[in-house]
Each structure stands twice: as C-alpha cells, then as structure tokens.
Curated annotation (Swiss-Prot):
Membrane-spanning intervals of the chain: 52-72
Single Gene Ontology BP annotation: protein transport
Domain of life assignment: Bacteria
Assembly, per entry: Part of the accessory SecA2/SecY2 protein translocation apparatus required to export cell wall protein GspB.
Membrane topology: Single-pass membrane protein
Protein name: Accessory secretory protein Asp5
Length: 73
C-alpha cells in the first residue's frame, strides 16, 4: 500500500510540475489603476481548463500526502 501511495505521489507531483511549466506567466501590475483593467480578461478566463486541471491535481496531491502521513503514523 505504501509503495502505491509513493508512486501516486510522485506521479501527481510530476504532473503538477508539468502543468505549472506549461502555463504562461501572468503580468503583475501593482501600480495600475483599477479603471485600466476594465474590459480585460480575468485570471480564470485565459487557459481555463489548464487552470482547473492544475487546481484538481494540486488538491489530489495534497490529499494523497495527508493520507500517506496518516498511514505511516
């Protein structure tokens, strides 16, 4: 059981790294006015499906690590 959890954790981590690398970088504008961003797409509107998959994989990795910690305690 522990080998399976370890392999699953490694696979989820590699998938998570690949997804993060494949996403384009977002521009950060700390100094701009709020009026200048009106009409521009929000964070979730660009690459929506990649970001949803990234969110799901990170939650699965977190839950797998929690379960692995419970099993080994």
């Amino acid at each position: 059981m522990q080998k399976l959890l370890l392999i699953l954790t490694i696979l989820l981590a590699l998938i998570l790294i690949t997804l993060v690398i494949s996403l384009p970088r977002e521009n950060q504008q700390f100094f701009s006015e709020t009026r200048s961003t009106i009409g521009k797409s929000g964070y979730w509107e660009t690459n929506f499906f990649k970001k949803i998959i990234l969110l799901i994989v990170s939650i699965l990795l977190f839950l797998t690590l929690i379960f692995y910690m419970i099993q080994t305690a």
